[in-house]
Amino acid sequence: MATSQRKILVTSALPYANGPIHLGHMLEYIQTDIWSRYQKLRGHECHYICADDAHGTPIMLKAQQLGIAPEDMIAQVNKEHQQDFADFNVAFDNYHSTHSEENRLMASDIYLKLRDNGYIKSKSISQLFDPEKSMFLPDRFVKGTCPKCKSPDQYGDNCDSCGATYSPTELINPKSAVSGATPVMKDTEHFFFDLPAFEGMLKEWTRSGALQVEMANKLDEWFEQGLQQWDITRDAPYFGFEIPDAPGKYFYVWLDAPIGYMGSFKNLCAKRPELSFDEFWGKDSTAEVYHFIGKDIVYFHSLFWPAMLHGSGYRQPNSVYAHGYVTVNGAKMSKSKGTFIKARTYLDHLDPEYLRYYYAAKLSSRIDDLDLNLEDFAQRVNSDLVGKLVNLASRTAGFITKRFNGKLAKINDTTLTEAFLAKQDVIADFYESREYGKAMREIMALADIANGFVADAAPWQMVKHDDQQEAAHQVCSNALNLFRILVTYLKPVLPRLAQDVEAFFQLPLTWDALSQDLAGHEIAPFKAMMQRVELDKVNAMVADSKDNLQVTADAPKTAAPEKTAEASSVSSEPLVDDPISETINFDDFAKIDLRIARIIKAEHVADADKLLKLQLDIGGETRQVFAGIKSAYSPEDLEGKLTVMVANLAPRKMRFGMSEGMVLAAGPGGSDLWILEPHEGAQPGMRVK
């Protein structure tokens, strides 16, 4: 038992309930599960909760296209999500849904407290409205001809063909992506959360140690720009919770989504009467609350969420831990390459423990992207887990069973055991601080020592000589005891292997029992515990991921409008989908001033689904450009890169600020979009000719 038991509540971000889990998602759930399992292994009271994020226009429209009720659709997705997580050995204490009575009551409670405390404002805004569906249209649900390059079938906030950004009212011949009708402007009353009122509290909290330094530094940029009131309203029809005392008005999905952490814990408390909700969420709570999230949702979790909690009389989280994205083979996950791998596709081919270990071996406390290099993945798992760890037992256990009645000897020389036990605090600190990669390196260094000990002693030679039987018994017993310590250290990462090893030793693996004397203890006959990664299975997984893409492309188009097939897959013949434009003369071309630019800063734009704000150095001058590339790049990936911009494009006033040019990109759009990157020999300000 740990010296003093902690009370801990830990969460992962809620997956959206309109599609399957993929390996990019799995990074976060594996990272959180390892941390939760470690806390429990140390004897702490730790509750790991999550839920499906089950509200919003995309879910409503997808259910309509499928011809089923949204409730039925999210119930099926919830079942699939839970099965994927269970098969990856992610051990939630509770997995719920934001579309629950607990969450409705919590969202209403928080909203009413914010309203009563003066933090909710109302004002009239103008939005495009679909007269046929009688619904207001978010930007991404309006399509038309780009006002800049005249490409048809573009979204209401940016053009996938030329990268231009604009407002929906600027589209030529705008149409509702829901019904095809021509939208009209209509006024509506919306409620806003007064985020600026919490600026002082948020500045203090974000610098309190609750966030990684990278996150806190990034949030300073939002403070410099000035916090804005946050629109928390959506108009009917909408799949979500109706706002109290406001018929036809619904909570925006990002209001009730983080409240889903509280709703899920409420649900757990109902199942476990010994748990107290207020003990974890009350304003004066001394319990610990931690959120694990992706770096793309830092803004919501580090500004809106703590402010909402503070304004409604609840405690703030102790920490919000962000992680980077997953790349595969050094590039963004790609459906066309077969590297956009669903969790279920992986599970159809490979052991989930392989991925748990590989992610752990590459994870740190920083917000770095993690590359799943499939060749390195196979080599590392085969070397570390099969060649070092399991091999330690497989090469010694048989002698104990066959020659020594399955019983372990009392170890006379405990030098190695003491050296292994001396590392427990170092490894514990690495788990606690989320430095899993460092923990794995420490453990594998110990595995190398243990294997070297066995190789030098060569018990397979000893057993051939009558006078060396006891020495062989000592070596094999010592090796198996070291194996037990190693697997105990790895138990948070490899729970299924740990379970098999517990059956082999016929006793539980606990941190408190690391130094247990197993003299005379009987072990079970050794059984194979882990197979090598076979590259043909890895290749089959990639091939099946490509097949899944083809099935999707051939299937009826049931996806929500913002996820059209054209936007999510790469055409094998770009000129077929996007023919060459009409010929222009040289004088027209010469008017365009293309310059090399270095991206010196990139950041998210609040309430913009596709935009990133870029600060571009063009050689002695800095330009601000809003680029519709958020679906393909995170800000951190762009900073420092060279690109090409249209430098003499007239500045355009947008609701987010002034855009002073355009960066160039290629690709059909969505995640398949690539900015142009000149050779490093080019310098900012150089003209492209």
Swiss-Prot record:
GO cellular component, one term: cytosol
Swiss-Prot/TrEMBL catalytic activity: tRNA(Met) + L-methionine + ATP = L-methionyl-tRNA(Met) + AMP + diphosphate
Name of one Pfam family that matches: Anticodon_3
Cofactor: Zn(2+)
Claim: Phosphoprotein is one of the keywords in the record: no
Motif ('KMSKS' region): 332-336
Cofactor note: Binds 1 zinc ion per subunit.
Domain tRNA-binding stretches: 588-689
GO MF terms, alphabetically ordered: ATP binding; metal ion binding; methionine-tRNA ligase activity; tRNA binding
Enzyme Commission code(s) on record: 6.1.1.10
Binding site for Zn(2+): C146, C149, C159, C162
Motif, 'HIGH' region: chain positions: 15-25
Residues bound to ATP: K335
Top-level taxon in the UniProt lineage: Bacteria
Class in the EC hierarchy, top level: ligase
Record's subcellular location: Cytoplasm
Keyword annotations of the record: Aminoacyl-tRNA synthetase, ATP-binding, Cytoplasm, Ligase, Metal-binding, Nucleotide-binding, Protein biosynthesis, RNA-binding, tRNA-binding, Zinc
Sequence segments annotated as region (Disordered): 554-574
InterPro entries (alphabetical): aa-tRNA-synth_I_CS (IPR001412), Anticodon_Met (IPR041872), Met-tRNA-synth_bsu_C (IPR004495), Met-tRNA_ligase_1 (IPR023458), Met-tRNA_synth (IPR014758), Methionyl/Leucyl_tRNA_Synth (IPR015413), MetRS_core (IPR033911), MetRS_Zn (IPR029038)
GO biological process terms, semicolon-separated: methionyl-tRNA aminoacylation
Role played: Is required not only for elongation of protein synthesis but also for the initiation of all mRNA translation through initiator tRNA(fMet) aminoacylation.
Summary of subunit composition and partner proteins: Homodimer.
Family: Belongs to the class-I aminoacyl-tRNA synthetase family. MetG type 1 subfamily.
Name by which UniProt lists this protein: Methionine--tRNA ligase
Organism, as annotated: Shewanella baltica (strain OS185)
